[in-house]
């Protein structure tokens, strides 16, 4: 998988994880990678799909701040972030069944 910034797939995901960790801080939350990146089928035009599920509501602006940090980062892919608490039940089930749990 080639990238415009010469980052390997593992380095790209490592950078995304670092940013997610910085923005979420010590808040309890499960972070899932799902979609083509989780299946190992990503291409240079694939976006990175993340879902976040926190036991307590995230403070206002947290996801917006996360999206902004990811956009401004060196990650050469679009990163979609979904709050599972606000997701459709069928979509939530799909993510929980097929997504890769990054952190808890």
Language-model features: where?
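Catalytic core of pol beta-like nucleotidyltransferases
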Residues: 1-32, 39-44, 54-104
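Conserved loop-to-beta-strand segment in the C-terminal subdomain of adenylate-forming
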Residues: 47
């Amino acid at each position: 998988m080639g990238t415009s910034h010469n980052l390997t797939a593992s380095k790209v995901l490592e950078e995304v994880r670092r940013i997610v960790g910085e923005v979420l801080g010590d808040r309890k939350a499960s972070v899932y990678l799902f979609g083509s990146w989780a299946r190992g089928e990503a291409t240079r035009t694939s976006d990175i799909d993340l879902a976040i599920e926190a036991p307590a509501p995230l403070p206002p602006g947290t996801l917006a701040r996360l999206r902004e940090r990811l956009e401004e980062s060196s990650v050469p892919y679009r990163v979609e972030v979904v709050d599972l608490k606000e997701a459709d039940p069928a979509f939530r089930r799909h993510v929980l069944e097929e997504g890769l749990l990054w952190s808890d």
